[in-house]
């Protein structure tokens, strides 16, 4: 079983940015797991301008914005798996996933980031135990 310092579930903008930032801060062994056929998440469907002003100081379409983050991940040599569904994350951070190439497989993580974007489920639907578990933040926390 492969071991990673960080496993990120979701290859959209949040997952890609988290991976690049983690690499820049000294995390060497990173795996992004994405269920779709390409990285970029929902941005690939957002053809209007308006992305990137804060991060890249220019106005970009969703696909252009996603491409910048994808390039950041590729430039840093961060590993990723596409068309891969996470089936389980155990309390000891063992991630069980599956895809056509590898079948069912497990990786051990030292840390896990759930960056599942607009498809994110509530904490209860994710079966994360406890009322207010430490270190668990959902996209809804910003609102």
Segments and roles (model prediction):
Residues 1-9, 67-143:
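FAD-binding core/adjacent interface of flavoenzyme oxidoreductases
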Residues 4-64:
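Beta1-alpha1 glycine-rich phosphate/pyrophosphate-binding loop at the start
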């Amino acid at each position: 079983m492969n071991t990673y310092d960080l496993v990120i579930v979701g290859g959209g903008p949040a997952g890609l940015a988290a991976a690049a930032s983690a690499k820049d801060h000294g995390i060497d062994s990173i795996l992004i797991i994405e269920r779709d056929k390409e990285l970029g998440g929902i941005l690939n469907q957002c053809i209007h301008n308006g992305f990137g002003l804060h991060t890249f100081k220019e106005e970009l379409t969703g696909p252009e914005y996603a491409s910048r983050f994808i390039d950041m991940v590729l430039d840093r040599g961060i590993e990723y798996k596409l068309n891969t569904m996470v089936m389980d994350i155990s309390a000891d951070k063992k991630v069980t996933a599956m895809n056509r190439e590898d079948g069912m497989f497990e990786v051990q993580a030292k840390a896990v980031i759930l960056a599942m974007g607009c498809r994110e489920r509530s904490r209860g639907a994710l079966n994360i135990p406890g009322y207010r578990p430490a270190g668990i933040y959902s996209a809804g926390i910003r609102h």
